[in-house]
Design a protein with these regions (language model features):
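Short acidic active-site motifs
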Residues: 4-8, 76-77
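Secondary-structure junction motif
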Residues: 27-30, 41-62, 128-136, 146
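Flexible hinge/capping segments at coil-to-helix
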Residues: 6-47
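Hydrophobic hinge/microswitch elements
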Residues: 48-106
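A late-sequence structural motif
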Residues: 26-27, 106-146
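Central regulatory/effector-binding core of bacterial HTH transcription factors
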Residues: 1-5, 71-72
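Short beta-strand->loop
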Residues: 8-18, 89, 93, 101-115
Length: 146
């Protein structure tokens, strides 16, 4: 017996990508970014993730081949490995300040060519619930209106 559930995607916004590294490697990779990523140890999302495909296409376009040292399904785990100086990792630029506050890493570069999109998923075609409406509008305004 299948479930008959309808779900609707509501775009909250999109963000470029920020690249992070741990000191002292950050200085090495910040200089000549993004060319400095060539051969650099990279922590990547798994291959079934849209961000992974976007990063690989961008690397190919700019002719850069980082060395993938680990793949992650879990973003928090990837950041923890990055903080432990295992490699460079990415996070949406929209939450860059949060990453800098929580992890002992620094920004080595950014790309607006690689985008991540964020959605609210609801059972309603048009969001009517007042609390959900406030949350989605706050995300659109506070996170994605730069």
């Amino acid at each position: 017996p299948g479930l008959n559930i309808r779900a609707y995607n509501h775009l909250l916004g999109e963000s470029g990508i920020t690249f992070f590294a741990r000191e002292p490697d950050d200085k090495l990779y910040r200089k000549n970014f993004p060319e400095s990523l060539n051969g650099a140890p990279m922590l990547m999302p798994t291959s079934n993730c849209a961000l992974r495909r976007s990063l690989e296409l961008w690397f190919e376009r700019i002719d850069v081949r980082p060395t993938v040292v680990a793949e992650f399904e879990d973003r928090a785990l990837m950041k923890a490995f990055g903080e432990a100086a295992t490699g460079i990792f990415t996070s949406p630029t929209a939450v860059e300040d949060d990453v800098l506050d929580k992890y002992a890493v620094t920004v080595i570069g950014r790309s607006e060519e690689v985008k991540e999109r964020f959605y609210a998923i609801s059972a309603e075609r048009k969001i009517k619930h007042p609390a959900i409406s406030v949350i989605t509008e706050a995300a659109r305004h506070d996170l994605f209106s730069a």
